[in-house]
């Protein structure tokens, strides 16, 4: 019998909902060994505060898994943390969780990582430039390009651009970037989703996919040449498709993933279908990383009302991706 994959789950911003959501991982049986990274006392206290006390055991790599306890790789807080109240002094603690999870993934200790939400603002206030998990992990693995993909509602939606002003999107979609984005998406669908010959639906940038150049020429000058080049190599790419009809069920049924050109072209449909249960996946990294699709929810922290659905879905997807990768030929 194959050993269960071991996943690192970072508990995120200590003032947010991450610690209590991680404690609720004990409510399910998982086809994996889950190791929560964080301050063990904080996680136990936050679970007790919301009326769900748990048993915590400090994680050791050589130790056998135990039932009914939450394994925590203890990383101490820099200063005490109260639910709902950010503390700049804990910014480095939050990044230490990521650093340890990443080191474990790169070194083979963990099969992947699942990240609870962090608060970008408080990290930046501490004097550390930080724009998000995705960029941080890319920088620390020397990965030149990563691709953001959301999974939920029966859809996989990747983005050619992410957090850019709409006015900057067109200039950011170049032939080299689009080509590499599609290569990454294709490769990870094969290697980490177990889809032997993925079919990718590619959105146009402009209304009606440019209407033959009358509503913009990006489809003619950038998108179509890239698709033609990659089709010649055997990739199954459909498009550029008008985004207003791409998400119709009969169109989605013929694809394994969608590549949208910008954030608000692709994600509103997916979040409408899966809000609270979606998963953010970073493609192109040398490690598996999934994340919840929500923020720190400081207003809910400590109340016991935070929904664990997205964290559960992120763990489920990370397990599936780890299993698919393990099946790939060495």
Swiss-Prot record:
Top-level taxon of the source organism: Bacteria
Family per similarity comment: Belongs to the PdxA family.
Additional information: The active site is located at the dimer interface.
GO molecular function list: 4-hydroxythreonine-4-phosphate dehydrogenase activity; cobalt ion binding; magnesium ion binding; NAD binding; zinc ion binding
Major enzyme class: oxidoreductase
First-listed, main subcellular location of the protein, grouped into a coarse class: cytoplasm
Name the record gives this protein: 4-hydroxythreonine-4-phosphate dehydrogenase
Cofactor remark from the record: Binds 1 divalent metal cation per subunit. Can use ions such as Zn(2+), Mg(2+) or Co(2+).
């Amino acid at each position: 019998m194959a050993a269960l994959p071991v996943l690192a789950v970072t508990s995120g911003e200590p003032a947010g909902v991450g610690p209590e959501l991680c404690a609720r991982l004990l409510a399910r049986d998982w086809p994996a060994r889950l190791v929560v990274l964080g301050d063990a006392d904080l996680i136990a206290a936050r679970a007790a505060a919301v009326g769900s006390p748990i048993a915590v055991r400090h994680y050791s790599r050589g130790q056998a898994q135990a039932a009914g306890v939450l394994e925590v790789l203890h990383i101490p807080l820099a200063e005490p943390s109260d639910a709902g109240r950010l503390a700049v002094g804990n910014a480095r603690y939050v990044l230490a969780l990521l650093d340890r999870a990443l080191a474990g993934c790169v070194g083979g200790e963990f099969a992947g990582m699942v990240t609870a939400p962090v608060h970008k603002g408080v990290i930046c206030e501490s004097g550390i430039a930080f724009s998000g998990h995705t960029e941080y992990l890319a920088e620390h693995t020397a990965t030149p390009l990563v691709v953001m993909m959301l999974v939920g509602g029966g859809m996989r939606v990747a983005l050619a651009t992410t957090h850019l002003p709409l006015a900057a999107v067109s200039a950011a979609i170049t032939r080299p970037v689009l080509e590499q984005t599609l290569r990454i998406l294709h490769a990870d669908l094969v290697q980490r989703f177990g889809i032997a010959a993925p079919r990718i639906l590619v959105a146009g940038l402009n209304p009606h996919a440019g209407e033959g150049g009358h509503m913009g020429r990006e489809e003619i000058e950038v998108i179509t040449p890239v698709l033609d080049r990659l089709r010649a190599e055997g990739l199954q790419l459909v498009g550029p498709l008008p985004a207003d009809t791409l998400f119709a069920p009969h169109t989605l049924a013929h694809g394994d993933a969608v590549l949208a050109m910008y954030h608000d072209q692709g994600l509103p449909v997916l979040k409408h279908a899966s809000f609270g249960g979606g998963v953010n996946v970073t493609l192109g990294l040398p490690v598996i990383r999934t994340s919840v699709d929500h923020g720190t929810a400081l207003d809910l922290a400590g109340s016991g009302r935070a929904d664990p659905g997205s964290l559960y879905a992120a763990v489920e997807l990370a397990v599936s991706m780890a299993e698919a990768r393990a099946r790939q030929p060495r």
